[in-house]
């Protein structure tokens, strides 16, 4: 309380309420870089970048980890940097009172607010965190009817969701966390492969071409969005905001230099990114203020005329005359006169003038306070204390300590919470234990609508009756990449899912079979199909087919089961 009382609040300014009663669409773009934007190749992104405010000194604070960048954007607070991906700041916030998140702001006015993600909702616990921010949340397998791939299509996400809010008679808020820009950047990346022809003549290496290709899916999503806004008469009253979650760490230092067309300073300049704030029919306003992720929320609150106590957010309205600093995750920072490297403890001005030690110390303390304040707000549910309210408490059934991979955590939660697999305890899933046929078959039985508790013998009989396994399979047998691929393909066919191959698939499969003659045709086909539909995967295509005889653990199987369930739901 004393710290907040000591902070000077920001004043209203000429832009306060500029977009009051407008619609708002916020896009957190996976691994986005400003070097993606090109007037000819990406006209929709170019339109976003040049209509409204142009923030020339915006920095994305984080080198990696989507959940941190997304948290800073949504909360106006720095995440607790001591936390891991599977025990993230968002996880903690799921039961906090969050009055300033844009979803809650719109919902408090009686307006619809939606959030979408084109991967599973259990990933990073978004199925719990995003409703607490005021959003009706949709994701693959939980209300968002679209195909899943690795990565999934941003265009498909936009196309599957816009009808839910564009016909609204009141202002609406829609939030998107995209996926198409996710690494690895090669032609095995589903979005890179899909858009290869759009970039194949560009003068870049394969990796950089693949990065640009997968980001073309974001461009096509935005083109569709603009078209739908025009169709529904919402184009002139919809603000669109886009920024990155983090630096595109899937590119090496030299590859990022290649993309930029120059050598990029790795301490500061690589974090220079885009905060696109498109306001229709507005002449561009150039803003040179130094700013970062946490400043977006208070800037939007001011633009939308929302009354808020600016002292309660770590970020500052960029359009105000407050103190402005672009802060990075390691507490390095940039001001309007110098930049400070936290690793070396040195400051450098933008010209030849020396930097005063007192200024460095003052800004270092300010930045440290921002991080500390943000952590205290999070861990102590501070807004509940200030406003005398609380969020609806959400029971966290499981908190698995034996899983550190957020992809596996999401799937383990899915499997345990739906009763498809049994966790060893509330805190242990048994992630590294080898998966056995009996458990996998019981999960498929339950997915198929079975309600009985089947013994090993009974579930084997059920599987044989449905032609899922041969007579020589026993419940205790472990499952491998190859055997589980065959099993899942038979299960999908039994569920009346079309598992046929296109002519392109057949050509690609023939090439794979020629390179892996030790694999029988049935196994090769099944593994190909599973990988194509992101049920089984490995970043290295060659390595993937070499795993046919490798045993899967329970965490890996849970991920497969989530993929199978999603596929059945989306095609039923």
Regions found by a protein language model. Give the residues of each.
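Solvent-exposed soluble domains appended to multi-pass membrane proteins
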Residues: 3-397
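N-terminal hydrophobic targeting segments that direct proteins to the cell envelope
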Residues: 1-4, 571
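N-terminal propeptides
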Residues: 392-572
């Amino acid at each position: 309380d004393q710290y907040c009382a000591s902070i000077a609040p920001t004043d209203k300014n000429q832009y306060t309420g500029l977009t009051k009663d407008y619609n708002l669409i916020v896009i957190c773009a996976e691994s986005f870089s400003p070097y993606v934007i090109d007037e000819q190749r990406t006209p929709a992104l170019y339109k976003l970048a040049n209509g409204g405010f142009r923030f020339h000194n915006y920095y994305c604070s984080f080198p990696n980890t989507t959940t941190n960048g997304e948290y800073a954007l949504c909360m106006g607070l720095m995440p607790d940097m001591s936390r891991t991906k599977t025990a993230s700041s968002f996880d903690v916030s799921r039961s906090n009172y969050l009055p300033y998140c844009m979803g809650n702001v719109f919902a408090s006015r009686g307006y619809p607010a939606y959030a979408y993600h084109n991967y599973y909702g259990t990933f990073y616990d978004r199925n719990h965190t995003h409703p607490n921010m005021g959003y009706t949340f949709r994701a693959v397998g939980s209300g968002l009817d679209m195909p899943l791939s690795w990565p999934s299509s941003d265009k498909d996400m936009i196309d599957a969701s816009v009808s839910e809010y564009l016909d609204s008679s009141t202002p609406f808020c829609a939030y998107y966390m995209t996926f198409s820009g996710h690494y690895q950047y090669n032609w095995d990346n589903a979005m890179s492969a899909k858009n290869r022809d759009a970039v194949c003549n560009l003068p870049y290496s394969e990796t950089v071409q693949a990065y640009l290709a997968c980001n073309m899916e974001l461009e096509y999503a935005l083109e569709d969005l603009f078209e739908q806004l025009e169709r529904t008469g919402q184009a002139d009253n919809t603000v669109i905001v886009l920024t990155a979650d983090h630096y595109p760490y899937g590119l090496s230092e030299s590859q990022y230099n290649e993309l930029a067309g120059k050598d990029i300073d790795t301490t500061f300049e690589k974090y220079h990114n885009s905060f696109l704030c498109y306001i229709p029919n507005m002449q561009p306003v150039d803003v040179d203020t130094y700013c970062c992720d946490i400043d977006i929320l208070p800037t939007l609150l001011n633009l939308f005329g929302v009354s808020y106590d600016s002292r309660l957010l770590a970020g500052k309205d960029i359009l105000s005359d407050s103190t402005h600093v672009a802060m990075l995750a390691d507490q390095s920072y940039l001001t309007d006169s110098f930049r400070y490297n936290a690793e070396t403890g040195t400051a450098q001005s933008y010209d030849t003038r020396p930097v005063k030690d007192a200024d460095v110390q003052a800004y270092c303390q300010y930045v440290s306070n921002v991080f500390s304040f943000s952590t205290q707000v999070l861990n102590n549910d501070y807004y509940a204390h200030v406003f005398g309210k609380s969020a609806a408490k959400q029971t966290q059934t499981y908190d698995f300590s034996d899983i550190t991979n957020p992809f596996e955590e999401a799937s383990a939660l899915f499997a345990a919470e739906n009763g498809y697999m049994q966790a060893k305890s509330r805190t242990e899933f048994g992630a590294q234990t080898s998966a056995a046929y009996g458990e996998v078959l019981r999960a498929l039985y339950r997915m198929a609508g079975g309600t009985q508790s089947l013994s090993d013998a009974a579930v084997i009989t059920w599987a044989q009756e449905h032609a899922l396994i041969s007579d020589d399979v026993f419940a205790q047998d472990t499952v491998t990449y190859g055997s589980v691929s065959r099993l899942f393909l038979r299960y999908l066919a039994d569920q009346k899912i079309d598992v046929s191959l296109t002519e392109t698939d057949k050509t690609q499969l023939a090439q794979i079979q020629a390179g892996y003659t030790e694999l029988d045709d049935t196994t090769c086909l099944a593994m190909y199909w599973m990988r194509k539909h992101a049920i089984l995967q490995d970043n290295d295509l060659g390595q993937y087919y070499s795993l046919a005889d490798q045993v899967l653990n329970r965490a890996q199987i849970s991920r497969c089961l989530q993929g199978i369930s999603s596929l059945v739901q989306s095609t039923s």
